[in-house]
Amino acid sequence: MRQKENISKNTADHHSEPKRMQMSNEEFLPFVVEQLQSHPHKTVTLPLRGRSMRPFLEDNRDKALLQYSAQYHVGDVVLAEIAPGHFVLHRVIAINADKVTLRGDGNLGIEQCRMTDLRALAIGFFRKGRTKADMTSGPKWKIYSAVWTRLFPVRRYLLFALHPHLPSCLKRK
């Protein structure tokens, strides 16, 4: 049985309850992209799946607040379609003309795509069940981003230490 995802589409009227829909994974992210492109001033709250943005964004715990953007910069966290139907939410680490290099905060490897493959900009994150987003424009996120991206040379060791599935011989008793 395939897992169903929930999507919340926030409207300009913040007093109304967000619209909730359920759909399969195959429909989910293309639907998000279509909503953002059709309504560029609205946001979509996307439940996060995967481990690529660890240690600060967790699988099935946190949510990204996405918005359409016409401009992207190094350091932005973006929703990108790196192959047809294959989406990632990763940080832009380099832009060279039309070529964009991405890396998940919890990854050591990179992905590449074109500027036209960037579908949305993460403008905030709902972490640890909170109802108030940590905005990417705020000091908390900027400090985290500056520190974590500069730690790339030792990230392999930090991620290993933070990984919840360490072999039992390495776990503290």
How should each PLM-predicted stretch be described?
Residues 1-173:
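Extended hydrophobic leader/signal-anchor segments used for secretion and membrane insertion
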